[in-house]
């Protein structure tokens, strides 16, 4: 029988080998093992640690796999502010910046004027905190002073070392020594495209940065691990020698196991900076990840401290952002889409063109007036522009390339979906289809909005299924969803008994959503998520909201006369009483959880923290109950906290609350206040 010491030695060897191959694959892009052989190593380590839990270490590669469900991300304070950089689109302003640095440093008698030019990665900024070489916390930038603790998700990113590389020098730590590393979390272009391919059209991410941001805030770390994120480091503090040059720090980061992107240059003058910018203006297209500019910063870290920072940005660095990417392509056709509120939107169908890291085949033309202003015709060569995260748009027509015989697209006078004559309300730019109850496109849009993630979050209900349900007359409004039968669903295309049951289960689960979510899901014009929350606070039920006068609605925070009129008009529509009755019969939340002030104001002005496990509420729903009664929910305990609700196995938050002498109540007492 193999002894525990031999197994411990094998586990240590496996951990070392796996981390080395991880680094070769994710950081150096020089893999030595096939995926199969790598998986064999990892599987063996997983087996050892499962059979002998005492062999598990905090920095084991098995801790990256994920599996933790996190219902909230507590707010944490950064060791030092994560400031944003001043930015410019002008090379001339970069020259002025360098000149200003030279003058300031000369006035201070500082020696050395070298700068470092490095690529500006278009990702999500995070901070990693290491204590005694071990990763103990990872946080988002947040507002620059406080961010969300997303350690559990960042641990799944293979290019983030769980333990700093072993070597003598600035990283060598005494007991309790903390080192902070900052950088960007990215999603490679090919991983972004693969992720979007798995998502329905209406739920696709606009760009890799949005996909990365959304991924990092997922509650299930297993899904984060599946999305192949990547980390690039650009800053480190907490070294023994804080006076190192920036280029030396980048090399230290590489030695410690981080990727720095390897795309930086020590520059001795503005000419070298401009050469770097010009090279990467074109060269960045070939990179596997998105970049949107170049950061120029002083190389001497002592000069960083000498020049300091404004309240928003450091004085020793600037970000040069490349001008918007442009491309020319053929405009194949112009189609007219109908939105859930009946808005008619012209959309340009384009010959697919690659621009700023993505392929563009469609672009909105916004409205008929914009179409006329551009003068676009099917068959034109057009200029497409994309700047940063902005959705690509048509900005001009190449009139000199217009073929003879083209003609303008005839503007519709009737709805493209149902044929109803279009109307243009006085004072508005857009045209609308007024056939709200009979237009299939509007019905589909309203049902999809009702089912969306931020509304009722109905699982297993996608666009293609909604299209079938509406086309067959099975669903005429969101209320009809709750009266669908398994046998009729199972007979639909690409369904079956299992899919039908899954949808019905999703509908059943959606009945647990809050009144505020339901109000948002109803799709009342101008009523967004925040407005729906304010309405749910002010009005205890759908009936109270219906009876509220124009003047009463106008007095609700964030609701002016335009929104008040929109709410009143919505209740006057002939189909609304029937919809409300269906939702009532289906058992949906047509009232706040407790009668409100219109609910009681026991939490009015209170800052509330939940800690420990609640038995009758989840954190999200409990928080909504507090907000509906005028309170504010936060995740950290401070002197400003007004109330702490302590559930089972409450930990450090409860202890801190006691030390601060804060008011602490049980879940039973919380329920009594509702």
From Swiss-Prot:
NAD(+) binds at residues 35-39, 84-85, 118, 141, 184, 297, 321. The keyword 4Fe-4S does not apply. Its EC number is 6.5.1.2. Zn(2+) binds at residues 415, 418, 433, 439. The active site is at residue 120. GO terms for molecular function: DNA binding; DNA ligase (NAD+) activity; metal ion binding. Coiled coil: none annotated. GO terms for biological process: DNA repair; DNA replication. InterPro entries: BRCT_dom (IPR001357), BRCT_dom_sf (IPR036420), DisA/LigA_HHH (IPR041663), DNA_ligase (IPR001679), DNA_ligase_AS (IPR018239), DNAligase_adenylation (IPR013839), DNAligase_N (IPR013840), Hlx-hairpin-Hlx_DNA-bd_motif (IPR003583). Keywords: DNA damage, DNA repair, DNA replication, Ligase, Magnesium, Manganese, Metal-binding, NAD, Zinc. Its cofactor is Mg(2+); Mn(2+). GO terms for cellular component: cytosol. The keyword Ligase applies. It is an enzyme of class 6 (ligase). It catalyses: NAD(+) + (deoxyribonucleotide)n-3'-hydroxyl + 5'-phospho-(deoxyribonucleotide)m = (deoxyribonucleotide)n+m + AMP + beta-nicotinamide D-nucleotide. PROSITE patterns: BRCT (PS50172), DNA_LIGASE_N1 (PS01055). Residues 598-674 form the BRCT domain. CDD domains: BRCT_DNA_ligase_like, LIGANc. Belongs to the NAD-dependent DNA ligase family. LigA subfamily. DNA ligase that catalyzes the formation of phosphodiester linkages between 5'-phosphoryl and 3'-hydroxyl groups in double-stranded DNA using NAD as a coenzyme and as the energy source for the reaction. It is essential for DNA replication and repair of damaged DNA. This is DNA ligase. The lineage of its organism: Bacteria, Pseudomonadati, Chlorobiota, Chlorobiia, Chlorobiales.
């Amino acid at each position: 029988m193999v002894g525990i010491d031999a197994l411990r030695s094998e586990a240590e060897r496996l951990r070392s080998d796996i981390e080395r191959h991880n680094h070769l694959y994710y950081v150096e892009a020089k893999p030595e093992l096939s995926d199969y052989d790598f998986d064999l190593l990892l599987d063996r380590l997983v087996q050892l640690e499962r059979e002998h839990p005492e062999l598990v270490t905090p920095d084991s590669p098995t801790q990256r796999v994920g599996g933790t469900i996190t219902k909230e991300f507590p707010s944490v304070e950064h060791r030092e502010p994560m400031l944003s950089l001043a930015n410019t689109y002008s090379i001339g302003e970069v020259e002025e910046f360098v000149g200003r640095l030279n003058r300031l440093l000369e006035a201070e008698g500082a020696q050395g004027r070298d700068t470092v030019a490095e690529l500006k990665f278009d990702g999500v900024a995070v901070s990693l905190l290491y204590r005694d070489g071990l990763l103990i916390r990872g946080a988002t930038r947040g507002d620059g002073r406080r961010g969300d603790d997303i350690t559990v998700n960042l641990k799944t990113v293979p290019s983030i070392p769980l333990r700093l590389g072993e070597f003598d020098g600035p990283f060598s730590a005494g007991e309790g020594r903390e080192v902070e590393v900052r950088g960007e979390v990215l999603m490679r272009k090919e991983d972004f495209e693969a992720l979007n391919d798995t998502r329905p059209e209406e739920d696709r991410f606009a760009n890799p940065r949005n996909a990365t941001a959304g991924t990092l805030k997922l509650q299930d770390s297993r899904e984060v691990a599946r999305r192949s994120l990547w980390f690039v480091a650009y800053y480190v503090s907490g070294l023994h020698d804080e006076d190192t040059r920036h280029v030396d720090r980048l090399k230290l980061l590489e030695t410690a196991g981080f990727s720095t992107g390897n795309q930086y240059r020590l520059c001795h003058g503005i000419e070298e900076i401009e050469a770097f910018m010009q090279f990467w203006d074109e060269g960045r297209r070939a990179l596997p990840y998105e970049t949107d500019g170049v950061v120029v910063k002083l190389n001497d870290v002592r000069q960083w401290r000498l020049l300091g920072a404004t309240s928003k940005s450091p004085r020793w660095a600037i970000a040069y952002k490349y001008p918007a990417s442009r491309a020319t392509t053929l405009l194949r056709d112009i189609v007219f889409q109908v939105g859930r509120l009946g808005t008619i939107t012209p959309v340009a169908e384009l010959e697919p063109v690659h621009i700023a890291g993505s392929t563009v085949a469609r672009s909105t033309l916004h409205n008929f007036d914009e179409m006329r202003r551009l003068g676009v015709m099917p068959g034109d060569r057009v200029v497409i522009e994309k700047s940063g995260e902005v959705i690509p748009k048509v900005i001009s027509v190449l009139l000199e390339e217009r073929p003879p015989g083209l003609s303008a697209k005839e503007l519709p006078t009737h709805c493209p979906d149902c044929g109803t004559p279009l109307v243009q309300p006085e004072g508005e730019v857009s045209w609308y289809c007024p056939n709200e109850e009979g237009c299939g496109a509007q019905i589909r849009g309203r049902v999809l909005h009702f089912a969306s993630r931020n509304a009722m979050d109905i699982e297993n209900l996608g666009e293609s299924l909604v299209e079938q349900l509406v086309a067959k007359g099975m669903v005429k409004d969101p209320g009809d969803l709750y009266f669908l039968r398994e046998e009729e669903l199972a007979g639909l295309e690409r369904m079956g008994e299992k899919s039908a049951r899954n949808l019905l289960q999703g509908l059943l689960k959606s009945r647990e959503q809050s009144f505020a979510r339901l109000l948002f899901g109803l799709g009342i014009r101008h009523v967004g998520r925040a407005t729906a929350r304010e309405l749910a606070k002010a009005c205890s039920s759908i009936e109270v909201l219906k009876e509220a006068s124009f003047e009463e609605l106008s007095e609700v925070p964030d609701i002016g006369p335009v929104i008040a009129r929109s709410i009143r008009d919505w209740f006057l529509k002939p189909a609304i009483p029937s919809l409300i009755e269906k939702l009532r019969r289906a058992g949906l939340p047509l009232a706040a959880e407790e009668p409100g002030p219109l609910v009681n104001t026991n939490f009015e002005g209170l800052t509330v923290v939940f800690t420990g496990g609640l038995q009758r509420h989840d954190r999200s729903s409990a928080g909504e109950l507090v907000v509906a009664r005028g309170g504010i929910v936060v995740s950290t305990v401070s002197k400003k906290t007004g109330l702490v609700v302590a559930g089972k196995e409450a930990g450090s938050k409860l202890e801190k609350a006691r030390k601060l002498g804060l008011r602490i109540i049980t879940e039973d007492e919380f329920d009594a206040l509702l």
